[in-house]
Amino acid sequence: MTTLMGSYSWTESLDCSPMDGDLSDGLSPHRSPREKGSETRIRRPMNAFMVWAKDERKRLAVQNPDLHNAELSKMLGKSWKALSPAQKRPYVEEAERLRVQHMQDYPNYKYRPRRKKQIKRICKRVDTGFLLGSLSKDQNSVPDTRGCRTAMEKEENGGYPGAALSDIRHYRETPSNGNKYDQTYPYGLPTPPEMSPLEAIDQDQSFYSTSCSEDCHSHINGAVYPPEYSRSPILCSHLSQVPIPQPGSSMIPPVPTCPPAYYSSSYHSIHNYHAHLGQLSPPPEHPHYDTIDQISQAELLGEMDRNEFDQYLNTSLQDPTEMTIHGHVQVSQASDIQPSETSLISVLADATATYYNSYSVS
């Protein structure tokens, strides 16, 4: 073994240690590069403020041992500015002497400012081999031959596996006029998956371009409200359809003809996809006064007793003993009232009831 190692020249350097070589040459022991740089670095000559602050800083540090060095520097700066030019002159002359001496000692000196220390990065690069090795827990698993997919492909696929995606695409591409038993649905479901109501609305955008007048006309004709959600068989209609005589027409304010916009004109487009969407949720419950909009004025007038206001208008013409009370309605048994007065009273009662009804709704 020794004969083999003796044939190589690099084994001679192993005989003596590097420390022995350094000591034999009379050199100092090995030092770090930072210490060497501090020794070889040439300091700049002090200016007048540095010459003055050299002794003044020591004096302030003794007087205020608890102050930080930054606070001492602020105090020194204020004190230096407060000095007069006559007081600064000896320090300026001393600084000039140091500058000349520095030029004689280092004629080729050039000021090189120190570079700012770079902040160490906390996040270091991880070796790809180590990362792949830590992720692959099963050594016998087959690698993916398709490679890495982009983020756009992942968003389009939505995280579904390949087989499920193919089934969903096949279901979407299947024509709707075919036999329902021939269609294949994903995940082995006997019925198609429910679609989002927003997706169904997006498929038919033409219904959203209708104007308010067309919506009102369609609501009046009764072509939008489905039978299972309508609360009353009679829809809202205009007051022009109710026969009211001329004297009471000025007391009636106009009533809006547009019904509530909960069921918009796009209801039929959603109803066409009823097989895919399932049963829609019922409309939200409104207070009781909203249902008055869906009851016609004719029905309200038909339920009102026209003789209700006669007791207030004809009290002076009849005997109090002739009046009877039935529940909450007081009916008068007057026989001396002419038919013309009765019709006028009925018209005023109808107009008053209609006015208060429309006022309470609005």
UniProtKB/Swiss-Prot annotation:
Please tell me in which tissues this protein is expressed: Localized to the vegetal hemisphere of blastula embryos. Tissue-specific expression in early neurula (stage 13-14) embryos begins in the ciliate cells of the epidermis. Starting about stage 24, expression is found in a lateral stripe on each side of the embryo, with expression extending more posteriorly as development proceeds. Expressed in embryonic vasculature, as well as in the procardia tube, endocardium, notochord and hindbrain.
**Annotated region (Disordered), positions in chain:** 19-41
Q: What induces it?
A: By maternal vegt.
GO cellular component entries: nucleus
Question: Where is the DNA-binding region?
Answer: 42-110
Q: Which Pfam families match?
A: HMG_box, Sox17_18_mid
Q: Where in the cell is it found?
A: Nucleus
Query: Main location per UniProt?
Result: nucleus
Q: Which UniProt keywords apply?
A: Activator, Developmental protein, Differentiation, DNA-binding, Nucleus, Transcription, Transcription regulation
What GO terms describe the biological role, i.e. biological process, of this protein? cell differentiation; endoderm formation; heart development; negative regulation of Wnt signaling pathway; positive regulation of transcription by RNA polymerase II; pronephros development
| PANTHER family hit by this protein | SOX TRANSCRIPTION FACTOR, TRANSCRIPTION FACTOR SOX-7
Q: What is this protein called?
A: Transcription factor Sox-7
